[in-house]
């Protein structure tokens, strides 16, 4: 248990930041799932629309340190490749 006033404050701040980050990660995952679901359904337009929404979110969270920049790049690359394959097949 924290003894100093500063340590108590840091505990409160850490918990507040954790809850904030959990909410942001959840939102990011939801957008990724929407894009993946549109690809799975074969809906090229919805997939492109969802991809356009998720890219700035991934970039923003990578720059803020919520996720690693390579993870953001990996998600973008894989989604982009799947959408490209879907649009050429259609």
Swiss-Prot record:
The keyword rRNA-binding applies. Keywords: Ribonucleoprotein, Ribosomal protein, RNA-binding, rRNA-binding. GO terms for molecular function: small ribosomal subunit rRNA binding; structural constituent of ribosome. One of its GO terms (biological process) is translation. GO terms for cellular component: cytosol; small ribosomal subunit. Disulfide bonds: none annotated. Belongs to the bacterial ribosomal protein bS20 family. Binds directly to 16S ribosomal RNA. This is Small ribosomal subunit protein bS20. It comes from Francisella philomiragia subsp. philomiragia (strain ATCC 25017 / CCUG 19701 / FSC 153 / O#319-036). The lineage of its organism: Bacteria, Pseudomonadati, Pseudomonadota, Gammaproteobacteria, Thiotrichales. The gene is rpsT.
């Amino acid at each position: 248990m924290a003894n100093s006033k500063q340590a108590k404050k840091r505990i409160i701040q850490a918990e507040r930041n954790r809850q904030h980050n959990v909410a942001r990660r959840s939102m990011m995952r939801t957008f990724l799932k929407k894009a993946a679901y549109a690809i799975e359904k074969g809906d090229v337009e919805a997939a492109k629309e969802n991809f356009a929404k998720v890219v700035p979110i991934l970039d923003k969270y990578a720059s803020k340190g919520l996720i690693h920049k390579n993870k953001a790049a990996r998600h973008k690359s894989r989604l982009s490749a799947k959408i490209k394959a879907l649009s050429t097949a259609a």
